[in-house]
Amino acid sequence: MTDCDLCGKGIPTVIPVRTYPPLLRFAYPEGVWKGLCETCLDSAQKTYLEVNRNHTSCRRGKCSLCGSKTGVFSVELQIPDFSKGIVRKDVDVCYRCLKLVDEAYIRYKREQIEQDHEQGRIHGHEHVHPH
């Protein structure tokens, strides 16, 4: 089990997102991997799309993924809680990390499609759905 780096939910596998923490840039010039659950990945990618579409202004803060003190955007998370069900919480993420989350989201969805496509070939033929 591993924990999501944004919401802390414990899950068997996380989706890797490369980040570039400013304090570690000399030790890790290629970046550091953070792990997100699918819900947090979806929320952060949704925020990225909204920022690009609406040109949302940022505010100064500390990014929850890379730790840089820069302009950040609010990402709404849905954190599971045994007593309250789902708790909504906002975390701050910088534009650079949002862009990296978007790349990870695209890569993750592409892998899911390829996996589904491969499962369709289990019996040696593709399942064709008429449209």
Swiss-Prot record:
The protein's name: F(420)H(2) dehydrogenase subunit O
Keyword Kinase: no
Thermal dependence, as annotated: Optimum temperature is 39 degrees Celsius.
InterPro entries for the chain: F420H2-DH_FpoO
Oligomeric and partner information: The FPO complex is composed of at least 13 different subunits.
Biological-process GO terms, alphabetical: methanogenesis; methanol metabolic process
Cofactor(s) the protein requires to work: [2Fe-2S] cluster
Gene that encodes it: fpoO
Binding residues annotated for [2Fe-2S] cluster, in chain numbering: C58, C63, C66
Enzyme class: oxidoreductase
Function: Component of the F(420)H(2) dehydrogenase (FPO complex) which is part of the energy-conserving F(420)H(2):heterodisulfide oxidoreductase system. The membrane-bound electron transfer system of the complex plays an important role in the metabolism of methylotrophic methanogens when the organisms grow on methanol or methylamines. Catalyzes the oxidation of methanophenazine to dihydromethanophenazine. It shuttles electrons from F(420)H(2), via FAD and iron-sulfur (Fe-S) centers, to methanophenazine (an electron carrier in the membrane).
Protein's UniProt keywords contain Iron: yes
Cofactor note text: Binds 1 [2Fe-2S] cluster.
Source organism: Methanosarcina mazei (strain ATCC BAA-159 / DSM 3647 / Goe1 / Go1 / JCM 11833 / OCM 88)
Family listed: Belongs to the FpoO family.
Sorted UniProt keywords: 2Fe-2S, Electron transport, Iron, Iron-sulfur, Metal-binding, Methanogenesis, Methanol utilization, Oxidoreductase, Transport
Activity-pH dependence: Optimum pH is 8.5.
Enzyme Commission code(s) on record: 1.5.98.3
Catalysed reaction equations from the record: methanophenazine + reduced coenzyme F420-(gamma-L-Glu)(n) = dihydromethanophenazine + oxidized coenzyme F420-(gamma-L-Glu)(n) + H(+)
An MF annotation (GO) of this entry: reduced coenzyme F420 dehydrogenase activity
